[in-house]
Amino acid sequence: MSHAELLAQWSAEKQIRRCMHQYMQLCDVLGPGSDLDELMSLFAADATWEGLGKRYKKTFGRYVGCAAIRQMFAGYTREPGHFLLNIHFLGNEEIHVTGDTASANWLLMQPSDFVDGRSQLSCARLSVTFVQRHEKWLIQHFTTENIFSRPMAARWDNTAELPVPDSND
């Protein structure tokens, strides 16, 4: 692989990583009043978003095309909201670029507090294909498959004071 090819591959990987990072940041704050335009700008017009496996296929289903994907996300923007706290941590990244397409995998850890008082920790395997259109990498096919989900006895965001060392020692 030439230096130019290697540089192009690294640049593509960085842009794909940035696209996924932006997707997760927007999902972290998705709630009433959220503008879905920025989130939808990360998807190709003919994109697919789907849940896989026994749990997520039933819970999330499959959405084809930006209009269907937008409608699915719109459910999270209605009052009174769904999440009080929602954080997406990605790890175990793997990205493979081939020309103007790429495939990528991540593990997702997601602690969530819900408006209805419940809290949960979920782990999922994300498999995402990307396509480069007009110099921009876009999500072509997003899949999420549950590895585990665990209800939590207490909220993640506890209002108790944080323990710190005594400064008088």
Per-region residue spans from a language model:
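Short, low-complexity N-terminal intrinsically disordered segments enriched in polar/charged residues
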Residues: 1-29, 33-42
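Generic detection of long, well-ordered alpha-helical segments
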Residues: 13, 17, 63-66, 120
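Short beta-strand segments enriched in hydrophobic/aromatic residues
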Residues: 27, 43-44, 51, 108-110, ...
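Binding-site signature for planar aromatic cofactors or substrates
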Residues: 11-22, 41-44, 53, 71, ...
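A beta-strand edge to alpha-helix "cap/lid" segment located at domain peripheries
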Residues: 3-6, 82-169
